[in-house]
Amino acid sequence: MRVLGLFERGNNLNFADTYVYTWNQQYSYHENAFLISNQVATTIILYLDGININEVNKAFELLNSNGIPALIIKPDHIGIFTSSNFTYDWQYKIVYFHEYTYYKNNEFIVSDEFWLYTNINELLPYKILYYERGMRELYAGREYTLYNTATDDDILYKYIYEKDSIMNGTDYKKLYDTNSVKNFVHFMRLLRMRFAVPFDQLSNRITRSRVFSKSRIHIGLRNESIPQALDNIHSQWINYSANGIVISELKGLGSYSEKKISEFGIGQFKNYMNFLTLMFYIKNMKKKPSCTIIGAAPGYWISSMKKYFTIVTYDNKEVDSTEHHNRYFTDDDIVNVKTNGVYIDVRSEFKTNDWRQRRKLIEEETIKWLEISYKLLENKRVEAILLKMTAMDGEIPDGYCVHSPTTYRKSEYYLLIDKHIIKRQKIKVTKSLMYNAINTIYSDNVFISGKYSLRGKTEGVLALYCLSNTINQKEKVIQYANSFSGTCMTVRLNNTYEVDKIIDFKTNSDHTFLPSDFTCSLNTILTSYRGYAGIFGYAITKDLKSNGNNHIYIIPNARDENNFDTFGSHLGLSRYSHSKRFSESATTMSGYIFRDMVSGKENMQDTDKDNYASGHVFNAIAHYRFDYTYDIVGWLRLHKTGQFKVKSDIYKEHTDSEIRNAIESAYVYYLLDGDKVGEKYSKKMMEIWEVQV
């Protein structure tokens, strides 16, 4: 949802799913904010004439801090604000739309400039446009700044990594006769326009920036964090991604199997991924990364990296780098290398048609550059090297096997080594071992590191989307969360009907958790993505759905001790239950009647007056488990310890019997729904309350 304030009245009811809210002058800004937040319409319009604007601003501030975007807009912007989802940076008054109507103009938006230098424009019937970070400014004024951030980057990534499985799918085959990139992009755009805009992905690009800059230890970084990692490259941080395969871990046998991976050239993509892999590997050594690139041309991606790294290049063709040597690298240059990283991407043009002779020359050249790498690592400045290798028999260092996709899969892969790796025992490899790796492994993450241990201090830790992984024991994750004092961590929310559900993905699986599993510090907030966004200065328009991809965000030191409702509060609590009541129930009072029936009350004449507020507790437990924005666990614990504070003119303290009745009602609700997870959840809530009692 979104709340839009307008000083000028207009024909705004023509927009679908829009509600005009009438400000109640008899209520405080706090109560008006609550009433606004529980409207079931997507867009809430508030006309501001005749209203105390200071009260409106306070209500909007409360909505925004709870992750519900509320702002006063210009009348001529009503169209885009009501028709598009967006992420609102309410601290700096910046609106980031996630808006794909540029498809009408036959445009294809990318955020990496090197795509402009491929033949992709010849294969697609669209105009390929590049914008740094995908950001297009739509409006800049005193009120706010508007950007559109939607891109087609994810379609390119899916083509590179997932096109075979997608094109072999039944739906694709029913629609298209050929497996072309043109048809693939058309298919992915069809899916997008079929109400499948990747909102979380687009919004996370924005909201991740603030939490990244506040953190020193990052757990589970993946490629979507590349922009934030680059922006913070000169600050102190390291990452743990449990990612990367070393040579000694390779298994299986294979043979040479050339395959065209992409219709358009992705050699620049491969080099960009390889370069970042090396740079972030050195970053994890607590060094300021820099790089010498040997065999750099054409290097269309290098110019955009100069702002983050010192890049020295060697090639007989021109390259836009920090320092370019317009010649080939020689042994004499080894002592002059001043960067701590070296990327070697050399393959000579051998003038022979004899494939055996060519293989012999390639292997000899590979050995030569491997020997040069050893010498480079004797240079006190050089910390790590990523070099091109080929499948061959022999002994090589037990470094990381890096194999980012390129246009044609042949015999090449890359080896990441450092000073420590080359001192360890070398690994004997065979052609067939390496061909199997080349044919089956594709590197999809530029962050390579060891596994994070759930021990020790947690200050400065940011762990988004990873600690739920089954490589960690569930009980140890709960213990870790209970003492967590970092920036933010997440676990996957169990909004299924299966107790202790484990969710499987392509390469791993996740435990699922309930908010009632945790006993964190009272100043720690447990909430949803929307609540997390509000805490860090953002608000989102998308209504949260129970789709198996929901997380519990655990955020220490976030509680406003003087006003519980500032963050992760009951704002928006009734939207879900309102929708169910109006579509499935005979009365809006059904929840309260249900509660009183469970309690055994025979005279329910005053159901709409007595204990009205405790309906919130029932609502929070019975309906909000599937999203968990309202931190009802924190509410229960604070309430009974006498530490609960809220700036509200209508709040009344609940009695012990009211709370018990609300929790029992939620239990019966789940029982009748056949929801075993809900039964467990409500029982645990009663345990939490009784401990506090």
UniProtKB/Swiss-Prot annotation:
It is found in: Virion. It catalyses: a 5'-end diphospho-ribonucleoside in mRNA + GTP + H(+) = a 5'-end (5'-triphosphoguanosine)-ribonucleoside in mRNA + diphosphate; a 5'-end (5'-triphosphoguanosine)-ribonucleoside in mRNA + S-adenosyl-L-methionine = a 5'-end (N(7)-methyl 5'-triphosphoguanosine)-ribonucleoside in mRNA + S-adenosyl-L-homocysteine. Residues 560-693 are annotated as: GTase/RTPase activity. It comes from the Viruses. Its EC number is 2.7.7.50, 2.1.1.56. One of its GO terms (molecular function) is GTP binding. GO terms for biological process: viral process. It holds the Pfam family Rotavirus_VP3. Belongs to the rotavirus VP3 family. Multifunctional enzyme involved in mRNA capping. Catalyzes the formation of the 5' cap structure on the viral plus-strand transcripts. Specifically binds to GTP and displays guanylyltransferase and methyltransferase activities. Has affinity for ssRNA but not for dsRNA. Capping activity is non-specific and caps RNAs that initiate with either a G or an A residue. Together with VP1 polymerase, forms a VP1-VP3 complex positioned near the channels situated at each of the five-fold vertices of the core. HAMAP family: Rota_VP3. This is Protein VP3. It comes from Rotavirus C (isolate RVC/Human/United Kingdom/Bristol/1989).
